[in-house]
Amino acid sequence: MGHESGHLRLTVRFAVAAALALAPNVAAAQAYQCRVPQGPVSVPAVPRDGPVRQVPVTGYTLALTWSPEYCRGREGRAADRRQCSGRAGRFGFVVHGLWPEGRGTWPQWCPAARAPTSRELAPNLCMTPSAALLAHEWTKHGACMVDAPGKYFKVSRILWNSLRWPDFDRIARADNLTAGQIRTAFAEANRHWEPEHVGLVVNERGWLKEMRLCYGRDFMPTACDRRRFGPPDSAPVKIWRGL
């Protein structure tokens, strides 16, 4: 127990140190005119969707969703109103979740001390514009990393705020765009990052859905394994810019 609690303390320290090393001089915004809600945020219940799996943490993945693609066809859905209606701002990449990784598998649904509070969720709704998703990610993934939801969201914000973004509107207009070009553009905008550190998820029609940034246990960038890397560099990829 002492060793595990020591690791929980080091998780936040490692993330802070890594973010200071990785932080760019200027970061392009990914949430345009986003407003954090002023009133209380409803804290939804989180049903478990898989088995408890407690394994040693060997690294992390910061999963980032490309909102224009996610919101295509979801603009009128109540569950996606904040992210997709435009009323709370316009979003580019947003944080899907910060996931601890294990050797050949990943930990999930570790016993959580408590659910997040409204006050813990609200400040993160420009990073992850869904209270339900924030609660889900803490319960499924975060509880396997740290001992309180506030710490999990803090580490996620530190990593998120350390990133610099190339102009994805310009990248999306490139002829014959490939996965390798997307990885290279991100790596060129972020010191210490290399293309092999950047995983991608595309749908069956070739549209970009997510970026998966791979970190070691020390929260420094590391090469993605095959499961997280996604399509080869030569694969054609399209990026939906929205209407």
What are these regions (language model features)?
Residues 76-243:
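Domain-level detector of nuclease and nuclease-like folds
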Residues 2-15:
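Bacterial N-terminal signal peptides that target proteins for export
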Residues 1, 74:
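Short regulatory "switch" loops immediately downstream of catalytic or recognition motifs
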Residues 23-26:
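N-terminal signal peptide c-region/cleavage motif recognized by signal peptidases
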Residues 14, 56-58, 207-209:
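Residues at beta-strand starts and edge strands
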